[in-house]
Amino acid sequence: MFGAIARRLFGSANDRIVKSLVKTVAAINAKESEVQGLSDADLAARTPWLKSRLAEGETLDDILVDAFATVREAAKRTLGQRHYDVQLMGGLVLHGGKIAEMRTGEGKTLVATLPVYLNALTGKGVHVVTVNDYLAKRDAEWMAKVYRFLGLTVGVIIHELDDGGRRAAYACDVTYGTNNELGFDFLRDNMKYRLEDMVQRPFAYAIVDEVDSILIDEARTPLIISGQAEDSSALYQAVDKLMPRLVPADYEKDEKARSVTYTEEGSDHIEELLREAGLLAEGNLYETRNVTALHHATQGLRAHTLFERDVHYMVRDDKVVIIDEFTGRAMEGRRFSDGLHQALEAKEGVSIQPENQTLASITFQNYFRMYPKLSGMTGTALTEANEFMEIYGLAVVEIPTNRPMIRKDKDDEVYRTSREKYEAIAKQIAECQKRGQPVLVGTTSIEKSEYLAELMRTTTKVKPQVLNARYHEQEAFIIAQAGVPGAVTIATNMAGRGTDIQLGGNLDMRMARELPADATPEQRAAKEAELRADIEKKKAQALAAGGLYVIGTERHESRRIDNQLRGRTGRQGDPGGSSFYLSLDDDLMRIFGSERMDSMLRKLGLEEGEAIVHPWVNKALEKAQQKVEARNFDTRKNLLKFDDVMNDQRKVVYEQRRDLMVTTDVSETVADMRQEVIEDIVHAHIPPKAMPEEWDSAGLAEDVRRVFGLDLPIIDWASEDGIANEEILERLTKDVEAKMAAKEAEYGADVMRMVEKSLLLQILDGMWKEHLLHLEHLRQGISLRAFGQRDPLNEYKSESFEMFQTMLSDLRERVTMTLANVQLRMDPPPPPPEPQGFAEHVEPEPAIGGGGVPGVAPAATDREAGHPETWGKVARNELCPCGSGKKYKHCHGAMG
């Protein structure tokens, strides 16, 4: 109450920020007459002039007014569009490293040209991030006219681009691309072996379009580059057979949190079932040796209790296909991670595809936090302002609309059943169409879209346009024409995002569709005039009918997604309306107290087909949504804390890797590693201050033979009178260094330097891959520590640190052992295969297997399966001596 009074007296914080921008906007406007009088050549020449001012020590803020005035004039000349004052404000907010909330139709794409041009003058490159390839390509082609007029280069990253094309696009002043492509390029770059093969430059500034979709909705989506792991389909099938034997008391399911865990009784029961099936090693289910069995039992439970066929996934052509929860589309080629997809395949009795092992991964949260400067645009961000600030340090500023918004939002209508709800929606649509009012209906899935469309065809004779396109170009055309009088478009709520619905239709879309490719300039002009007149006529009809009417078929967990649907109408001061039709069967209503609401409706004597409509209902629903939003925020925040642990380790590994790639001579690093390994081996068998009779001389001799390939008289050394452990260390060091010096003399220093660098990078990659797998397994079971009154996050931090230290120790030993036991042949190196990437539940195709180190083979001795150092030279296509049944090049030959 007091907050509301204070806001009326002093204005909100947002109002104060907007007011503070007015002075700068006035200064830009004052420059307009000056730039208007310039010739095209003189206007373009302002770019080198502004760059020279930066070179002389001025800051971006010093040249901002001149830069914004220049872009505005260039847009007028190339696009025929002049930035409004509110668009200048949006540009200022973006340049300030904040999120600009701008309503649909306010021209966010044009707004971005202002800060993009200004920041591109530094020469460090600006990334403009969109949600799909179509929008990246469209925006790049559209806005490139402005940038190129002013002498800047523009690139676009799309899926089909090869490394050469990507490198060229990233080298441009302005680069458009999707969040997935940019993230995968970062991961792939950190798997390359030569600096010149990397495609990205150091990060400088990114503007994220639809920032809420990318940084909130997809925040938990890790980008993963994977390789194929061992086939464990038989284990998934065996565990799946146990699931029907569980009873509801064996697990606790939280529908709100979409999670399921075994109860104490359930843990005992599944342990007993696994032991009966011969799937459990000795000890209990939660011991380290049984981590694989626990993993499969957990994923099997999730598959059977949390995931419903035709809701979360569908079965098609002997495959389990994910259904996108935001768009309702089938997501071909994507797979749930952590073995969940295999558990679903076992449940449905389809072919089980091999699991993929993570080679590299990063979440969008951590990827975008690497940019020194970050900003974003969207029509809906204020409801998540706290999360943007807490996670990314981004303030949200609501930009005023250019014209007052006159859309009428009606109160929700709540029906008892979904059948009554859909009948009421069909009736409302028929009424709108009768008066020529265009209607957009938002649903949560393709199935619901098709159900409503069929209902309308059979009961009202209305033939709606159902939007379930798999191609963004087609989707964009349908959504762009949804403002034609009498049009009825049914779409999943997120479909077509990024494309405006203009009353009367979209001129550019119609020109692209109706103008022949070989049209002459005269034919083009005539067609444009004809279409423009037709669109204006239809716009007048749509306006007279009340503008676009938006209908929501149910509330989402997030108010933001509801607001996105509403925001489709009422653009640029146009009239419009919106209403939501709900039923007690809807997910949100069912999860949050529909029983209480049902009994209340019965007491009110609500007849079939009648709805309850009251502002109180809206408020109650908003409170429920706020609870879900807060819970989801806490989940994302908690996951980020865990991911930050891995992120710190990832940064260390990637920085070390880059340092190795920059350095041509890593002999000093290798020598340091070798010395540490020697000291570790000696100290392990000859502890400090131990008496000679306590020394494990035989063990030391065996380890020296294993690691360095040297048969030294260590037992004799240890029996000498007065020998000290330091002397043993000195003798061992001397003999090892002599062996390595002889190897260098035999092959030459240049060859050894190349081999050292190649081996070090490759072994580091292999061990990082193994470490990621260990971290995944640790993460899956860590929440159970809470039962022992221990904090899972602290446990994860300490254990993952120990695992990281172990990885580094193992790395030193493996590099040292490989270099000490290799013999070289001078074959040309084969090109490494390209890894493939995917997002989150996305594990499309197997990726890389590691690729052997060029020209390296162990010395030939008698082969023992468990001792690779005894295998000698193994042909790449020969079966691996370890007994795996795989070819050597796909097994130990892939690891160096």
Curated annotation (Swiss-Prot):
Cofactor binding note from Swiss-Prot or TrEMBL: May bind 1 zinc ion per subunit.
Protein family (similarity comment): Belongs to the SecA family.
Organism per entry: Rhodospirillum rubrum (strain ATCC 11170 / ATH 1.1.1 / DSM 467 / LMG 4362 / NCIMB 8255 / S1)
Record region (Disordered): 827-869
GO biological process: intracellular protein transmembrane transport; protein import; protein targeting; protein transport by the Sec complex
Reaction(s) the record says it catalyses: ATP + H2O + cellular proteinSide 1 = ADP + phosphate + cellular proteinSide 2
Database matches in PROSITE patterns: SECA (PS01312), SECA_MOTOR_DEAD (PS51196)
Residues annotated as binding ATP: 87, 105-109, 500
UniProt-listed Enzyme Commission number(s): 7.4.2.8
Name of protein: Protein translocase subunit SecA
Subunit details: Monomer and homodimer. Part of the essential Sec protein translocation apparatus which comprises SecA, SecYEG and auxiliary proteins SecDF-YajC and YidC.
Gene: secA
Subcellular location: Cell inner membrane; Cytoplasm
Topology with respect to the bilayer: Peripheral membrane protein
Cofactor(s) the protein needs: Zn(2+)
HAMAP family attached to this UniProt entry: SecA
Disulfide bond sites: none
Role played: Part of the Sec protein translocase complex. Interacts with the SecYEG preprotein conducting channel. Has a central role in coupling the hydrolysis of ATP to the transfer of proteins into and across the cell membrane, serving both as a receptor for the preprotein-SecB complex and as an ATP-driven molecular motor driving the stepwise translocation of polypeptide chains across the membrane.
Record key words, sorted: ATP-binding, Cell inner membrane, Cell membrane, Cytoplasm, Membrane, Metal-binding, Nucleotide-binding, Protein transport, Translocase, Translocation, Transport, Zinc
GO CC aspect terms: cell envelope Sec protein transport complex; cytosol; plasma membrane
Matching NCBIfam families: PRK12904.1, secA
